[in-house]
Amino acid sequence: VTRLIATDLDGTLLRDDKTLSARTVAALTAAEEAGIEVFFVTGRPARWMDVVRNHVQSHGTAICANGAVVTDLRTDGGLLAVRALERDAALHVVHTLREAAPGTSFAVEMTTGINYEPAYPPFHLDPGASVAVAEKLLHEDTPGAGAPVLKLLAHHTELAPDAFLDLARTTAGDRASITRSSPSALLEVSGLGVSKATTLAACCAERGIAPAEVVAFGDMPNDIEMLSWAGASFAMGNAHPDVVAAAKGRTAANEEDGVALVIERILAARAEGRAEAR
């Protein structure tokens, strides 16, 4: 029996225009009314959660930054847990990737916001960001740099995204967890062992929820461990091939309400007293 639904946001629950369809909102509401907890599990930092803040269940909990943060969206992003990336590990990855993939630029996502190198592309302009080389951004004596590091971001302008990920994991994967969720060659580096899956597993253990009672949804490599861990899991119709291989099932694309389709099926089966259609 499903007790918890864990869903990624971008490319999964959200449409391409970063909104939730009316059908998806209705499915989320119906799940809560049926006693199923829904967790948003995303690579986004907590400060980018406004898009779903009005749709979080009464528990308020969301997992952000690929598992580095558990936040309470009811308290305007209050942090319930932080799994930081140690600075020496981050610096090791910086130095390793600079050597292995010249031209790599970096950004540092902290609990206080993002800072980045001059060469790092401004995916989202942040007027409060500090701009300096990564070593300075990671130096605790730099003003504002003493906060916990949630993610190191690494961008390359020429390498193919999967090739960049493979290179980074081969050269630096012994010191940090490295994944990606962007269509560009943008890598997300977390503390060793930190992932959506490990943080979700901890949250479920606190609630006495077993993996077999969890249904998970995702579309990109940073979802793979979570989809493998959950008892039932679905790759979106628009998912990366590696995600399709890792998931136990497949649903429609994010533009076609793929998450809502499965939730509706689960609830319909439950209402009829049948085994859930997973």
Regions found by a protein language model. Give the residues of each.
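Active-site phosphate-binding/coordination module
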Residues: 22-123
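Hydrophobic packing residues within well-ordered alpha-helices of enzyme cores
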Residues: 24, 49-53, 164, 168, ...
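Mg2+-dependent phosphoryl-transfer enzymes with acidic/Ser/Thr/Gly-rich catalytic loops
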Residues: 1-4, 20-21, 190-278
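Asp-based phosphoryl-transfer active-site loop
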Residues: 3-16
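Active-site glycine-centered loops adjacent to acidic/histidine catalytic or metal-binding residues
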Residues: 8, 42, 219
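Short, structured coil segments at secondary-structure junctions
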Residues: 56-58, 65-66, 172-174, 229-230, ...
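Conserved acidic, metal-coordinating active-site core of Asp-based
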Residues: 100-217, 221-222, 226
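Residue-level signal for inorganic ion chemistry
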Residues: 11, 31, 42, 66, ...
